[in-house]
Amino acid sequence: MQKNTEPAQEAVHITPSQQMIASSVGALLTSFLVTPLDVVKIRLQAQSKPFIKGKCFVYCNGLMDHLCMCTNGNGKAWYKAPGHFRGTMDAFVQIIRSEGIKSLWSGLPPTLVMAVPATVIYFTFYDQLRVILIRRMPERAEIASLVAGATARLGSATLISPLELIRTKMQYRPLSYKELMICIQSSLAKDGWLSLWKGWGPTVLRDVPFSALYWHNYELVKQSLCQRYNTLQPTFAISFTAGAVSGSIAAIVTLPFDVVKTRRQVEVGELEVFTYSHKRSSSTWKLMSAIVAENGFGGLFAGLVPRLIKVAPACAIMISTYEFGKSFFRKLNNERQLKSL
């Protein structure tokens, strides 16, 4: 039982503001290292099937998915830059040579405006809630990470969902603050408050189970590795390994919901932009049935390898950086306490 209460005791020495700083650094580093993979993937997709005006595609900065709108069929947007790539590595080399290394982070800054705050809220909320749950039910401490992970993701997804839809609509036509308010008021008058959370359902169906599985397995793997290497605090390598393993497991289990969520996210985004359309977006379960009808049950697990390549390193980098930051602040706080004695 003592082992299960150790995380709660450790977290006491870390203030929420310090958790926020640690998660902010982790979020920025994760975006910096993972975004080039998605930029290259999008460029390869655009080469094989050029984007047309008004169509959406999903852009991932390692923290969360964002809808991007192809606003000009003849424009020179980063995802339309010319190039003849023979593969992933060739794309990396050619982009750096012809466009400069900065091009590997094309489109990143606007997405960080929401991704970083969402990640900070998510990680801080998780740690704080997990401590509370362990204190209140120490006999069931093993499920604290599962409940805290699911709840934290539900909260952050609910807060960010309206902002993401507004950002998507603004991509297609730049709006002043006054025009934006009129647009929001019109949407509320027509469809009610729930219209701001279009696409929330598929996001929650994927992200909440993912988060619950991820944190539950992460804490188990971390504890197991700490015991194996006889250490009370996880090293960077332990956190990195535990993050990659738990992220991979969660990614595989929730892949069907990711396939559905991606398709519906694009569909909802296009409907939000083309306000004149009377078409209604399909429900999550109808989309899932359609995918099975078109491609069989295996269609729900399409893109497994690309998802693992994206999720595993992102989870590993984020959690290991976050744990390193918490360890730094824990030592700093302990030193301050010793000096005050």
Swiss-Prot record:
SUPFAM superfamilies: Mitochondrial carrier. The keyword Manganese does not apply. Solcar repeats lie at residues 14-132, 140-224, 234-328. It catalyses: glutathione(in) = glutathione(out). One of its GO terms (molecular function) is glutathione transmembrane transporter activity. The chain crosses the membrane at residues 20-40, 105-125, 143-163, 200-221, 236-256, 299-319. One of its GO terms (biological process) is import into the mitochondrion. Its main location: mitochondrion. It is found in: Mitochondrion inner membrane. Keywords: Membrane, Mitochondrion, Mitochondrion inner membrane, Repeat, Transmembrane, Transmembrane helix, Transport. The keyword Translocase does not apply. It is a multi-pass membrane protein. Pfam families: Mito_carr (PF00153). Belongs to the mitochondrial carrier (TC 2.A.29) family. This is Mitochondrial glutathione transporter SLC25A40. It comes from Xenopus laevis (African clawed frog). The lineage of its organism: Eukaryota, Metazoa, Chordata, Craniata, Vertebrata.
